[in-house]
């Protein structure tokens, strides 16, 4: 099974690093595309077996799974250049981009997944939320298997994606804010570190 990741920024790079450490998809079957070669050079220095390219169409040519790891406002632009085949599975990690929006670019028959991972995926510690459209039970299980290897994964309906995204993506920030407030309260009460 070959995977193409479009975008080598924070999340795309983190997913590539996580996949390279896993056992389900060999690192040599992962191709990462990004127009900026600096991100690709850094990624390949860490994981030389990962394939890299600056050309999105080249990256997806033989891919079974195409992961879009670009900013939401770039989705239409990227999908206008890459032309998915019906056998390819599209995975979008762009927050707030719905299936309805993705279908406008790829057509109603395409198998699509929406994923919300977090950057802990590079350390195999992500909590990844998954929604599917036009996917078989086997495809859903494959996504769960892949992303459970990179932390924990849970299949949810798309209608719950926005609310659960706030918890999984921002949850750690809420915890750290509480710790910071507790520390400040301690200082104000005369307890110094």
Question: Language-model features: where?
Answer:
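Internal alpha-helical scaffold of NAD(P)-dependent oxidoreductase catalytic cores
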Residues: 101-111, 127-164, 174-193
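Hydrophobic packing within well-folded, soluble alpha/beta domains
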Residues: 3-5, 66, 91, 143
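A general structural signal for well-ordered alpha-helical segments in protein cores
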Residues: 8, 12, 40, 63, ...
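NAD(P)+-binding Rossmann beta1-loop-alpha1 motif at the extreme N-terminus of oxidoreductases
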Residues: 1-54, 58, 125-126, 187-189
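Catalytic, metal-anchored helix/loop core of enzyme active sites in primary metabolism
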Residues: 167
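Rossmann-like NAD(P)(H) cofactor-binding subdomain of soluble oxidoreductases
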Residues: 37, 56-61, 65-130
